[in-house]
Amino acid sequence: MELEWDEAKRLANVQKHGLDFAEVSSLDWDNATFLEDARRKYSEPRFWAFAMKGPWLHVVTFCLRGAKVRVISFRKANDREVKRHGPKAT
């Protein structure tokens, strides 16, 4: 998977969430849950991936640009998201 991102956004994400966009490639993508972010009309479709990294569920907001995954946000999942999308969710 080829990743891309805005460098200023990556630095802001590290500051806010302590997670670097470069770590997104180490998520368990094979077992991820994907949802479209339809909260508003964006200029291009956005998606959420809920995937494990170690013992923690993480959330990646991204869009697709050709064959590349453009990372928009990367953070640990909140309690509600863990219940809904975590490994023990049904």
Regions found by a protein language model. Give the residues of each.
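Ribonuclease/tRNase effector modules and their secretory precursors
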Residues: 1-90
